[in-house]
């Protein structure tokens, strides 16, 4: 079934066929904090403050102020759903993405009238207003404004003509203005905007919203796995076995995802910076993946919007920042990156990788490692160091043996309790640049931290020493199929 998924609507149709994976409501909802507040209880999960849980995706059919639009949330807020949408098993997702990176299928131009341009609104229209055209929610009452959390930003380098797709923090700032936040030195489109600014040029950009989940997952790869010049839309093409189709924008010299629900066209303005919370003055941006509300930036870049195009009766897609949806989008590409790097260095040892919900998909990874010979003792720790190299934002790595389910944190903690000694099996790497959104990465937290964003990376080696394996066999139960006893 999943091979038929090519856009948001076919993805939702697939989930509709699966028990307990999609619910719809006709009760009107306010996109300002209420919508996210509802879904927090229904299925956000992740690092969201409890009570929350993993639950179904949800469609709100009646959104206050937007009579012709729906809002979908939580599509990727379950590893099981992501696997179904990509036609694989949950435990195979990282390896599948790793293969897709190695066998990319580049995007192609769409022929004909693009679905995303069925309705066109130009910024020159007298009644043009982003607030009315795009039902972007706020997650909490403290948010700087309405946020587009699942916008696929697509741009072209002004010198090299290479393309890139990335998800960025986008806040509606006015009727025809968006702010965009670039993590300093970490994102390709940020580098493109900086180069365009050096040249005194505007950077054309398209923002596609409501697309094939394969695009959303693929767009979250980062260097070194996908260096500058690698178009992550090629990963989505490989996942689907066919290229992503792009159409020419209506008002700027750029392309957009042809079957998106919405496309926002515009230009990143050189020399222009805006205060992210200039309209709310709350001091906050929005809830971020670590589970805290991030501070508003006073140096966001400015996008001058030139058009909004969309399908007829469009579906806005959104996510809650700290939800399980972010864990899926950030974590699974990280798993693929770690697996690919370690497999090249020491083939056959790394069995699997899981980037846990507790780390928001970025801060924590569990590596399932198989020691094949006495000389493999110590290689598990080398694998952890490679993981830190593959993904700089990673903070903690847990190492477990092949008989431990790396996707079950209770099993991981069991290994920690029975195969780990704190004075022997903790390896720390202090003073390493990590992720700026971790509030403990700050000199105020510890005098050993020289600058905000620097952390102590830690390895927890919960593997059995190779020469002691015979003493750590788990209880062996009878292997059988229990279905005979479960039939009614």
Where are each of the predicted segments found?
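Extended, highly charged
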Residues: 1-302, 306-488
């Amino acid at each position: 079934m999943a091979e038929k998924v090519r856009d948001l609507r076919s993805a939702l149709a697939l989930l509709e066929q699966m028990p307990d994976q999609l619910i719809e409501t006709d009760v009107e909802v306010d996109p300002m904090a209420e919508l996210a507040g509802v879904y927090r209880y229904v299925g956000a999960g992740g690092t969201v403050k409890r009570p929350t849980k993993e639950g179904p995706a949800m469609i709100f059919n009646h959104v206050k102020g937007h009579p012709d639009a729906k809002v979908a949330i939580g599509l990727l807020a379950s590893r099981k759903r992501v696997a179904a949408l990509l036609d694989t098993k949950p435990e195979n997702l990282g390896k599948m993405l790793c293969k897709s990176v190695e066998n990319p299928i580049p995007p192609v131009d769409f022929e004909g009238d693009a679905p995303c341009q069925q309705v066109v609104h130009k910024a020159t229209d007298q009644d043009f207003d982003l607030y009315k055209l795009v039902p972007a929610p706020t997650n909490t009452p403290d948010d700087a404004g309405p946020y587009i959390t699942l916008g696929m930003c697509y741009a072209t380098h002004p010198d090299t003509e290479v393309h890139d797709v990335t998800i960025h923090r986008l806040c509606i700032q006015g009727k025809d203005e968006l702010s965009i936040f670039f993590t300093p030195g970490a994102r390709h489109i940020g580098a493109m905007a900086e180069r365009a600014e050096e040249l005194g040029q505007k950077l054309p950009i398209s923002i596609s919203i409501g697309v094939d989940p394969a695009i959303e997952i693929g767009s979250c790869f980062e260097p070194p796995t996908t260096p500058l010049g690698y178009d992550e839309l090629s990963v989505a093409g490989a996942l689907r076995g066919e290229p992503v189709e792009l159409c020419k924008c209506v008002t700027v010299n750029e392309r957009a995802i042809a079957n998106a629900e919405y496309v926002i066209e515009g230009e990143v303005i050189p020399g222009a910076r805006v205060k992210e919370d200039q309209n709310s003055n709350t001091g906050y941006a929005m809830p971020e993946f670590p589970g805290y509300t991030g501070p508003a930036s006073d140096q966001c870049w400015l996008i001058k919007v030139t058009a909004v195009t969309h399908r007829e009766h469009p579906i806005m897609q959104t996510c809650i920042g700290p939800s399980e949806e972010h864990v899926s989008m950030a974590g699974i590409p990280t798993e693929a990156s770690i697996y690919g790097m370690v497999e090249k260095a020491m083939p056959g040892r790394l069995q699997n990788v899981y980037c846990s919900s507790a780390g928001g998909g970025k801060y924590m990874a569990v590596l399932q490692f198989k020691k094949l010979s006495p000389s493999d003792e110590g290689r598990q720790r080398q694998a952890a160091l490679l993981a830190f190299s593959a993904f700089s934002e990673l903070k903690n790595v847990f190492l477990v043996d092949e008989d431990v389910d790396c996707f079950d944190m209770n099993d991981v903690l069991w290994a920690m309790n029975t195969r780990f000694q704190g004075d022997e099996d903790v390896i720390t790497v202090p003073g390493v640049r990590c992720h700026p959104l971790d509030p403990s990465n700050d000199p105020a937290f510890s005098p050993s931290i020289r600058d905000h964003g620097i952390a102590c990376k830690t390895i927890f080696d919960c593997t059995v020493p190779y020469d002691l394996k015979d003493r750590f066999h788990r209880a062996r139960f009878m292997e059988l199929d229990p279905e005979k006893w479960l039939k009614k």
